[in-house]
Regions:
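Extreme N-terminal starter segment of soluble prokaryotic enzymes
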Residues: 1-3
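Residue-level detector of beta-propeller blades
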Residues: 65, 131-133
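Residue-level recognition of the GNAT/N-acetyltransferase active site
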Residues: 84-88, 115-117
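Conserved G/P- and acidic residue-centered "switch" motifs that form tight phosphate/ATP-binding loops
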Residues: 91-93
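C-terminal "cap" of GNAT-fold acetyltransferases
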Residues: 110, 114-121, 127, 137-160
Length: 160
């Protein structure tokens, strides 16, 4: 079972390493070698650590951090959903996504959005997200990647 905890600034390097491993393993074939190298260069202190101030979470299995996920409340956007390669296909990504959606529901957010990497579109579709049009993602670091903007309506429980 995945234990999910809120990330702290001290978790930035751990989260960055999960991201790097996941991209290098799961995005091969969807993006060029040059894009992959640019995407995974650097270190957490290059700006990734600032994400820890948002609704950023780590997923743990037997004391090991194996997944990350974030909900940007300013944009109702899901992001940074990564799972270590050795743990993919076991439902941990879905569990983290469900957690992020639950956080959104608790804040009465009716729809969440995301920019799916080309290799992750079918995963998100399987989780109820819709979107087909390919677009271009511009990262804060200047990286340009093809993506598919997707959205999911959430059922928000009325207050009683």
């Amino acid at each position: 079972m995945l234990e999910i905890t809120r990330a702290t600034p001290e978790d930035a390097n751990r989260a960055f390493d999960i991201r790097r491993e996941a991209i290098r393993s799961q995005c091969i074939g969807a993006y060029s070698a040059e894009q992959m190298a640019l995407w995974t260069r650097g270190k957490a202190a290059d700006g990734y650590d600032a994400l820890m101030d948002k609704q950023f979470y780590l997923g743990w299995v037997n004391g090991e951090a194996i997944a990350t996920g974030m909900l940007d409340l300013d944009n109702n956007e899901v992001g940074a959903l990564f799972v270590r390669p050795a743990f993919t296909g076991r439902g941990y990504g879905k569990a983290m996504l469900a957690h992020l959606e639950a956080v959104a529901r608790q804040r009465a957010i009716e729809e969440v959005v995301l920019d799916a990497t080309l290799n992750a579109v079918n995963f998100y579709r399987g989780c109820g997200y819709v979107g087909d049009e390919q677009a271009v993602y511009h990262s804060p670091s200047g990286l340009v990647l093809a993506c598919v903007p997707m959205a999911k309506r959430l059922l928000v429980m009325p207050e009683s």
